């Protein structure tokens, strides 16, 4: 599996959070595509 994106934490900048969530969504898509 690809590495899970790192959570930037509660005091992260909004841009960091947006980047993290888009990376996380991409990561989940990769995993679910491999599984099924």
Curated annotation (Swiss-Prot):
Subcellular localization(s) per the UniProt record: Secreted
Q: Which UniProt keywords apply?
A: Amidation, Hormone, Secreted
The Tyrosine amide modification is found at: 36
* Biological process, per Gene Ontology: feeding behavior; neuropeptide signaling pathway
Among the Pfam families in the record, one is Hormone_3
Family annotation (InterPro entries): Pancreatic_hormone-like, Pancreatic_hormone-like_CS
Give the CDD domains listed for this entry.
PAH (cd00126)
Q: Which GO terms describe its cellular component?
A: extracellular space
One MF term in the entry's GO annotations: neuropeptide Y receptor binding
Transmembrane ranges? none
Q: Which PANTHER family match?
A: NEUROPEPTIDE Y/PANCREATIC HORMONE/PEPTIDE YY, PEPTIDE YY-RELATED
Query: To which protein family does this belong?
Result: Belongs to the NPY family.
Q: What is this protein called?
A: Peptide YY-like
Species of origin: Caliraja rhina
